[in-house]
Each structure stands twice: as C-alpha cells, then as structure tokens.
Regions:
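Signature of extracytoplasmic/envelope-associated structural regions
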Residues: 1-391
Length: 391
C-alpha cells in the first residue's frame, strides 16, 4: 500500500486453489465455480501468464508500415512453489488440488494419506486465483498440471513446485459505481472503469461479494440481480484464508538408495505428464480440453564421492566381459522429509533405473557424484512413485 494510493504487495498476496467439479469451472457463467477461504494455500512464489497471438497483416498495402493485426489463439501458463507443509493426522495439504492434478490419485484414495498415480486421461483440473490488497485478482480456470517437482538441497527447506497451463484467464481490478441500482443486473461503472473487469471477474460492492461478471459492454457489467448506491467502490472479491501446516526444515530426514543411507547434498524428483493441450481446433479462442500423454518420473541424487559411496554410482552398469552385453541396475529409493512423527513426507520410488552423468570434480574441493534416475512401473503401470503425507 502506498502513502496515497493502494499498491499490490507480494507480502499480502493470497493464493487459492480448488479442484473443479467440471473441467473449466463453468467459466464466465452464472454458475461459475466459486472459491472460499478454505481453498487458500501458502506459496513462496506464483506466476500467471496470459498471452493472445496478434499476427501482422501481410498482404500488399502500399506502405512498409504495419497498419493492421489479426487475432490468433490465446495461451495461459502458470507456476507456483511452496514449502512442504504437513499438518498431521489425516489432513490433506492445502496444495492438495495441485498434487492430485499432477498425479491423478486423490489423497488417501487407495492407501491412507498417500498419493498415487493414475493412468486416467481425465486428470483433475483446478480453479486457481490470487489476490493482493484489493488492487487486483487473477483467476485461472481449467488449470492442468504439466510438471510437479519435490526438491531438497543442503540445509534448505524442502519445496514442492508446479507448472502447467489453463483454459481461461481473468484479471479483475477496481472501479466505482455510476448511479444506483435496485434488483438490477446491469452494473454501470464510472467512465473508463470497465476495462478493469473481464468476463469471469468476481467482484464485491455494497457489502455484496462473489458477484460474477457474465458479460461486459464498455463500462456496463452484467451480474446477478443486485442493489447498490452511487459512487460505491467495486473491488475484487477475496477471502479470509484458512490454512494448515508448518514448513519442514532441511535438517531432518534421510535418503536411502538400495537400502544404503546416503548423506546427500541435493535431491529432486519431477513428474512430467506430457499434456497435449487441444488448442489447434478451428473456431476456438484457445484451449478447451487436453490429453495426458506418456508420463515420466525422473530425478537426481547428489552425494560427495566418498570411497564407500562409489558403488551407489557404479551399480548403474554391470558388464561381465569386454564383449558381453551390460545389465542395468534397478533399485529402490526412499526419501524421508522431516523428522517429527506424524508430520513427515515420504517419497517412495520402488523401482528406479540409475542413469548416467559425469562425476563433478572441481579444482580443489571434494568431487560430487550425480546419480540421475528414472522411475519404472510394474507391468500394471501407475506405481512409479508414491508420496505419503503426515507420516
């Protein structure tokens, strides 16, 4: 907040995410799916990017200057990062909708407090929003998760991050009512204020909240029947956050590779869904559906090149003679994050094939073994990785 005019401040950002009942969340309609304070999640950072392709008109025009442009497809992308925040008991993490969106399996659906992968094409979609200081609100509808990563290094706090795309984007600013309304559906704003609102904006005025803009014409917004007086502030709706959990520290936990505990310097694992957005259909402004492609689960372990740890790298490749075909090692990996019982996050990769990377040897300091891996599923599929919460 500035001295005379409100500013959006990162420290006041509120982030919300909710699994959609139907893909796209009924965007821009009177039944658009709503958010609430219970959908809040704490994030370290977030990004929402909206672009619309504008192509220069390229036919003959008698001048070297560009005089006209043509509208192309819209594209929406997003990312966010959070601490790992287990809350204990059977409470799902606040970021649960995004984990389920990445993995497909719900919290505790098969095994209590454990996320598992799903081979379904119908990965859940998420309605996501962030608000700041009554200055602006951004909403994304039909969010899919392309990547989810869990990482830890040194003594830093372990983190979870997500990225993906979405069907639709809405930016909501502020305005002021022009005139009064009684059980009216056309909310007139002061001249020039209309640009601060889009179809799908969720606004508050006259002690009313969650009013959805279903259409807009210059400075007139179409909303559900409402009443208001003149010169009232119109602001983006926000909610009082309800969140749970405390960050895991980076000094408690362990990693075992093939039953050997390693004092790792870094660890990460990433689920990539191979999502194909269906954005190439004619007569569509952007993406209205997607197909989940081949999934990969890959990661990396870094550990100092101590004499007794060389075998952790060497076991990736075994050759019995100079001409014999090699065999490749598949080993289990378990990562325990946190040390307080009931508030740990445990990552299980039951079958990991160790991949290849160079040993990092600096000029004077200790060498580092980099051990990349690819998680493999059994013949049934869908069991490359499990993530257990509140252990």
């Amino acid at each position: 907040m500035g001295a005379t005019t409100d500013h959006a401040l990162g420290r006041n950002l509120r982030f919300f995410c909710k699994k959609e009942a139907a893909a796209g969340g009924a965007y821009g309609t009177a039944s658009q799916e709503a958010l609430a304070g219970a959908d809040a999640a704490k994030v370290l950072s977030s990004s929402m990017e909206f672009t619309v392709t504008r192509n220069d008109r390229m036919d003959a025009r008698g001048t070297r200057s560009i005089q006209e442009r043509i509208t192309g497809k819209q594209e929406v992308s997003w990312s966010c990062e959070s601490y790992l925040l287990p809350a204990g008991s059977t409470t799902a993490p606040d970021i649960d909708p995004l984990i389920e969106g990445a993995m497909g399996g719900a919290f505790g659906a098969s095994t209590a407090k454990t996320y598992k992968l799903s081979d379904s094409n119908a990965l859940p979609t998420v309605h996501m929003a962030r608000t700041a200081n009554d200055v602006f609100r951004e909403d994304l509808f039909g969010c899919w998760v392309e990547e989810m990563s869990i990482s830890a290094s040194g003594g830093e706090e372990p983190k979870i991050s997500f990225s993906g795309g979405a069907f639709n984007y809405v930016l909501t600013g502020t305005g002021t009512t022009e005139g009064t309304g009684s059980s009216a559906t056309s909310l007139v704003t002061e001249s020039g204020n209309g640009v601060n609102f889009m179809v799908g904006s969720v606004i508050s005025f006259n002690s009313l909240a969650d009013k959805i803009v279903t259409a807009k014409s210059t400075d007139t917004l179409t909303i559900a029947s409402s009443s208001w007086s003149d010169a009232q502030a119109i602001t983006p709706t926000t909610y009082t956050e309800t969140t749970a959990g405390n960050p895991l520290n980076g000094i408690g936990g362990s990693l075992t590779l093939n039953s050997v505990t390693l004092p790792v310097t870094a660890f990460d694992v990433t689920i990539t869904n191979g999502v194909k957005p269906l954005s190439d259909a004619a007569f569509e402004k952007g993406t209205s559906d997607f197909i989940a492609g081949y999934r990969s689960v890959k990661g990396n372990i870094s550990v100092r090149a101590r004499k007794d740890f060389i075998k952790s790298l060497a076991q990736r490749y075994v050759q019995t003679t100079a001409t014999a075909g090699p065999s490749f090692s598949s080993v289990p990996i378990r990562v325990d994050l946190g040390s307080v019982s009931g508030k740990q996050v445990v990552v299980y990769v039951d079958t990991a094939e160790l991949d290849f990377a160079a040993i990092d040897v600096p000029e004077a300091e200790e060498a580092i073994l980099n051990i990349p891996f690819t998680a493999l599923a059994t013949s049934g599929g869908g069991d490359e990785i499990r993530i257990a919460w509140n252990q």
